[in-house]
Amino acid sequence: MNTRPDEALRAALGSADASVRLQAALSAGTYPNDAYVDVLVDRCAVEADFFVRDMLTWALTRHPADLTVPRLTVETTSAVPQARSQAFHSLSKVGDPRGWAAVTESAIQDADESVARASWRAGVILVPVGQEGEVATMLSTQLGRGDRDVQLSLARALAELGDHAVPALRAARIHPSAGVRAHALAIERLIEDPDDYFDEAIFEAMRIVTRQGEPDGTPDGTPDSTPDSQRDPRPEGTE
């Protein structure tokens, strides 16, 4: 009895040999079959090898978006973190605007950092024209979150929105957390100068925030632009 193509693919993707799984994913993308979509999405949730996962996503982009986008959208609500993160990653690669429906506040605030970061990236790629400010506002709720890599991911996402992100970033200038304020200032700097380095931008932003003290030294949280050379070195309250 002949084995169905989707069953053969599932068996190959279940091999203990990563090279076999990689070849199976490559073949599934080279010779698309509608029956492969569920198999590919299911495998994304458990695949341990980065290169195989990347090939699985590529294979999904080779299939009709009418099939992949609805299936991936459902997968973004899976109980398995890897399933959610890979679904967002795949949606961003498919690039179909219908995938925007999966980018919710709960996804952007996902407790799993890999899921959150994937949803941030998907959000800036899939956001409909005219709703860039909306996604910027959602992303700004994550300012100050996580370690350097997480903050860099958010910075890249917001910087990609360009001027659309500026109102949300400026609103964060009066946030009670110094870390949030510094992160926002650093991203504004990156938007103004895309060639700047994140580490330098965040260092300078922290310097400004620290100098302002708690609470901010200016009513609206705007950085004090007075050059150090022009500052009065005497302590406040002295003549």
Q: What do the predicted segments below correspond to?
A:
Residues 24, 56, 87, 119, ...:
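Conserved hydrophobic register position within alpha-solenoid helical repeats
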Residues 1-12, 31-46, 65-77, 96-109, ...:
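Amphipathic alpha-helical scaffolding segments comprising HEAT/armadillo-like alpha-solenoid repeats
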